[in-house]
Amino acid sequence: MRVIFTGGGTGGHIYPIMAIIERLKERGISKNDEILFVGTQKGLESKIVPAAGVNFETIQIQGFNRKHPLKNFETIKLFFQATKSARKILQEFKPDVVLGTGGYVSGAMVYEAAKMHIPTMIHESNSVVGLANKFLGHYVDKICYTFDDAAKEFPEKKKLVKTGNPRSQQVLGLHEDKVNLQKELGLNPQMPTVLVFGGSRGALAINRIMLKSLMELKKKPYQIIWATGTYYFDSVQKKLEGVDYGDNIKILPYIQNMPALLPEMTCVVSRSGATSIAEFTALGVPVILIPSPNVTHNHQMKNALDLQKAGAALVIPEDDLNPNNFVSSIDHILLDEKYANEMSEASKALGVPDASDQVIKVMEEISR
């Protein structure tokens, strides 16, 4: 099966595609030369995709400027130019199906494919539908989604298929070869442990609250792994020069093998991006979510509230974050085993362990 995947800008648009590609190859459905990822040169995909050995092409496009509407004339012009580039790629590659995950590049690629009567589908990872996917919902053959709230935003009900996030299945496979990373970090594998992180680059608000809470956390009968993010690591280390923050806290720039570490955690403190949530629910890890307020349509807050409603997460809005509610939330999970187990079961109930296979099934059904 020849497939064009398209999406970009953020990891939430890229990682589901990478998970599907991995599964297509594992099952022998598509060889490497039958798979193409179309993104932009400036997006995160331009680094991640080629590094994974996946064929990659780019088209030039930009998003709408909400602060300066007059600049959107250029955006519209670029969109129509991008559809011409998309048509050329489609004619040359001759895909059996085109799948988009969001981002403006997917808008051009999937729209043009639909106009050419090539089978098309989209996948929405968040609880709030992005602009590109909302637009494409009218034209595609199928709409795959993760959160029920997202499904409500699409009027095309017959096209909807609940598949979950493909990253769920991938992360389950990645952690099968268990290694005890806590032991490698000099921690006690028998003690309750919380992982605190804000993504690969880190999150300023999470790092700030950790700095304010360290003296209280060092007294606790549990362990903390704090991944500051590569961007903030040096500044955090500088602020902690000469500070005794205890033996129960390990500070790292980032976690290299996150899928291997997550199953060992009693609890995780994190942002609430779609990819992270897919990982947590696949593994049934209780989470304290601090949604980023700096995202389109506040979708991280809505993602987080969906988990909290299901009993799988505690949510602390960034504006409400203080050392008292931060530490007490961690205590609530790590010092109450019954509550932690209930959260874990609620989280697992939301996960879809065969999400990639479910998306591939839809691809096979509509492919020409």
Swiss-Prot record:
Record's keyword terms, sorted: Cell cycle, Cell division, Cell membrane, Cell shape, Cell wall biogenesis/degradation, Glycosyltransferase, Membrane, Peptidoglycan synthesis, Transferase
Annotated binding of UDP-N-acetyl-alpha-D-glucosamine, by residue: T10, G11, G12, N126, S200, I255, Q300
Bilayer disposition of the protein: Peripheral membrane protein
Pfam families: Glyco_tran_28_C (PF04101), Glyco_transf_28 (PF03033)
GO cellular component: plasma membrane
One GO BP annotation of this record: cell division
Catalytic activity: Mur2Ac(oyl-L-Ala-gamma-D-Glu-L-Lys-D-Ala-D-Ala)-di-trans,octa-cis-undecaprenyl diphosphate + UDP-N-acetyl-alpha-D-glucosamine = beta-D-GlcNAc-(1->4)-Mur2Ac(oyl-L-Ala-gamma-D-Glu-L-Lys-D-Ala-D-Ala)-di-trans,octa-cis-undecaprenyl diphosphate + UDP + H(+)
Any one GO molecular function term: undecaprenyldiphospho-muramoylpentapeptide beta-N-acetylglucosaminyltransferase activity
Gene3D superfamilies referenced in this protein's UniProt entry, alphabetically: Glycogen Phosphorylase B
EC number(s) given by UniProt: 2.4.1.227
NCBIfam families: murG
Name of this chain's protein: UDP-N-acetylglucosamine--N-acetylmuramyl-(pentapeptide) pyrophosphoryl-undecaprenol N-acetylglucosamine transferase
Originating gene: murG
